[in-house]
């Protein structure tokens, strides 16, 4: 399913709507160029899961954990990882077993570990306009914006 957004706030709104319907253990594999809006989408996702705290890119920490919402949110940035072999060094399997949502930026760097993932592809179509594709392994019938 595709969504067209015209501002970062609208991109966040799509993320928030998705956050309200996700089930425990969901892996979201983000794809998109630098500056496409992956972190903005995750800010909305966190809001949809019930978080009020600021959401920032985990570029330097590799993973940011948000606990205390409807489900735990683990926000990963795989930009600096060379391959999925590096995932095991950061405890990927432990995160999967915790029953939260794993939101993975730069998932293409670890694509072979994204089994059963929901793919979120964000295309930059203008300065603030985006086309967001959501595909695979999720029923979007209950998604309401």
Positions of PLM-derived features:
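Short phosphate-coordinating micro-motif centered on Lys-Gly-acidic
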Residues: 1, 47, 85-87, 93-145
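Conserved lysine of the Walker
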Residues: 38
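Short beta-strand-centered segment that lines the nucleotide-binding/catalytic pocket of NTP-utilizing
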Residues: 51-66
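The conserved Walker
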Residues: 34
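Hydrophobic anchor at the beta1->P-loop junction of P-loop NTPases
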Residues: 28-30
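Phosphate-binding P-loop
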Residues: 19-24
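N-terminal pre-Walker A segment at the start of P-loop NTPase domains
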Residues: 1-17
């Amino acid at each position: 399913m595709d969504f067209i957004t015209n501002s970062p706030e609208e991109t966040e709104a799509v993320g928030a709507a998705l956050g309200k319907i996700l089930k425990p253990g969901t892996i979201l594999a983000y794809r998109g160029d630098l500056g496409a809006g992956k972190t903005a989408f995750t800010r909305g996702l966190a809001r949809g899961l019930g978080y009020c705290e600021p959401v920032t890119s985990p570029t330097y920490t590799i993973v940011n954990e948000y606990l205390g919402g409807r489900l735990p949110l683990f926000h990963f940035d795989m930009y600096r990882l060379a391959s999925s072999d590096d995932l095991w060094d950061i405890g990927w399997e432990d995160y999967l077993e915790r029953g939260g949502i794993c939101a993975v930026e730069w998932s293409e760097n670890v694509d072979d570990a994204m089994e059963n993932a929901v793919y979120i592809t964000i295309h930059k179509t203008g300065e603030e306009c985006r086309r967001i594709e959501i595909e695979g392994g999720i029923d979007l019938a209950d998604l309401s914006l």
